[in-house]
Amino acid sequence: MPVLDATPGQPLPLVAVITPYFEESLDLLWQCHRSVLAQDYPCLHVLVADGQPQAAVANWQVDHVVLPQAHGDIGSTPRLIGSFHAIGLGVEAVAFLDADNWLHPCHISTLMRARARSGAAFLSSGRMLCRLDGSVMGPCPLIDPERFIDTNCMLFAKEAFHLLHHWVLMPDYGHLIGDRIMLHHVRESGILCQHVNEASVYYRCGKPGLYRQMGEEPPAGIPARPDYEASFQRWLADGNAPL
């Protein structure tokens, strides 16, 4: 695995990609990071350790933010802290990438071109569903800019930065459906949104339902489906609009 030296003094990229991580292997982190390095639009990669830092990451071309303990919120807190770190440095947009996923080289440039054309403050893409070994199953049929955008497919431009705090201020039961809650706040805010159909995010499937959605049997040992319904019900019980 190559070791990259950080290059202080270089111009700050306009876009940051924020990756929270917890106990993912160094190999997965490297695949994730390598895909950010390969973007054809310059990006700052911010890796945020949620209480379990990998020492080797400090030698990569990243901003490595280490939190002293884990937050147990499926990456929401490190996602927000990484975003605010990058915004404080002066970036004009933040995107998200989970530690076990990776990007097509044109992902960021495609979204930023869509922003330039439309003036949108929130951009989104499709995603490609992949098996645990990284092989591709096909485009995700669930992505719908009106109802569901995966976190990895989201880009917030500066006009949408005021919405990012919802990663942490959502109710504790909400982190399981955090991407739907964030899309709810985006749509409620009235900011201009633009969706790009290209499936430029590679999403490693760790949930049985996605395999069945694609007509495959889930691999042995994969965790049981989380209880999303309980979170949706509590969201409604709290007086919120359906997601």
PLM region spans:
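Short, acidic, metal-binding catalytic loop of nucleotide-sugar glycosyltransferases
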Residues: Q31-C43
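Glycine-rich, basic loop-to-helix element that forms the pyrophosphate-binding segment
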Residues: Q69-A86
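Acidic donor-binding/catalytic loop of UDP-sugar-dependent glycosyltransferases
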Residues: N101-R113
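Catalytic beta-strand/loop signature of glycosyltransferases that borders the donor
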Residues: S124-G126, C193-S200
